[in-house]
From Swiss-Prot:
EC number: 4.6.1.12
Co-factor remark: Binds 1 divalent metal cation per subunit.
Organism: Listeria innocua serovar 6a (strain ATCC BAA-680 / CLIP 11262)
Site (Transition state stabilizer): 35, 134
Enzyme class: lyase
Function: Involved in the biosynthesis of isopentenyl diphosphate (IPP) and dimethylallyl diphosphate (DMAPP), two major building blocks of isoprenoid compounds. Catalyzes the conversion of 4-diphosphocytidyl-2-C-methyl-D-erythritol 2-phosphate (CDP-ME2P) to 2-C-methyl-D-erythritol 2,4-cyclodiphosphate (ME-CPP) with a corresponding release of cytidine 5-monophosphate (CMP).
Family that this chain belongs to: Belongs to the IspF family.
Residues at which 4-CDP-2-C-methyl-D-erythritol 2-phosphate binds: 9-11, 35-36, 57-59, 62-66, 101-107, 133-136, 140, 143
Gene3D superfamilies: 2-C-methyl-D-erythritol 2,4-cyclodiphosphate synthase (3.30.1330.50)
Lineage: Bacteria, Bacillati, Bacillota, Bacilli, Bacillales
GO term, biological process aspect, one: terpenoid biosynthetic process
Cofactors required: a divalent metal cation
UniProt xrefs under InterPro entries: MECDP_synthase, MECDP_synthase_CS, MECDP_synthase_sf
Protein name (database record): 2-C-methyl-D-erythritol 2,4-cyclodiphosphate synthase
Length: 157
């Protein structure tokens, strides 16, 4: 059996936060604002995985009204969901994700992100693809107000 899920996340950029994307700390003057560490890439991936197994969404498992998840490490949240997915007998077929940001440039960090995500999903880096794009200065990402991410995942049982 195969299952496909897609996920999307967006967070506002803020001067008083660290920038963490794909589980990697990226040196930048701004970070992402959110209840957890606001890792848009890991949130999109987590939501895609949850969608693939038909289990609602990330907010159902980790509500932003629950102080237990205040400043939570998104890698730990993804790992928690992945344990449940593996317990149901699924493994990763492949994952494709896109980060949408005008700045900072993501290219220097993409390989580190791929390796970190593969580690969290007990997969090979070749099963994980991460890429980045801009919106050519259009919209909220183009105005550097926020960063978005999309993810598609294929699970196999």
């Amino acid at each position: 059996m195969i299952r496909i899920g897609q996920g999307y996340d967006v967070h506002k950029l803020d001067y008083d936060r660290e920038l963490i994307i794909g589980g990697i700390k990226i040196p930048y003057e701004k970070g992402l604002l959110g209840h957890s560490d606001a890792d848009v890439l890991l949130h999109a991936i987590t939501d895609a995985i949850i969608g693939a197994i038909g289990a609602l969404d990330i907010g159902h498992f980790f509500p932003d009204t629950d102080m237990a998840y205040k400043d939570a490490d998104s890698a730990e949240l993804l790992a928690e969901i992945w344990r449940q997915v593996e317990a149901e007998g699924f493994k990763l077929g492949n994952l494709d994700a896109t980060i949408i940001a005008e700045k900072p440039k993501m290219a220097p960090y993409v390989e580190l992100m791929k390796r970190r995500i593969a580690e969290l999903l007990h997969a090979e880096p070749s099963q994980v693809n991460v890429k980045a794009t801009t919106t050519e200065k259009l919209g909220f990402t183009g105005r550097e107000e926020g960063i978005a991410s999309l993810a598609v995942v294929l699970l196999e049982k």
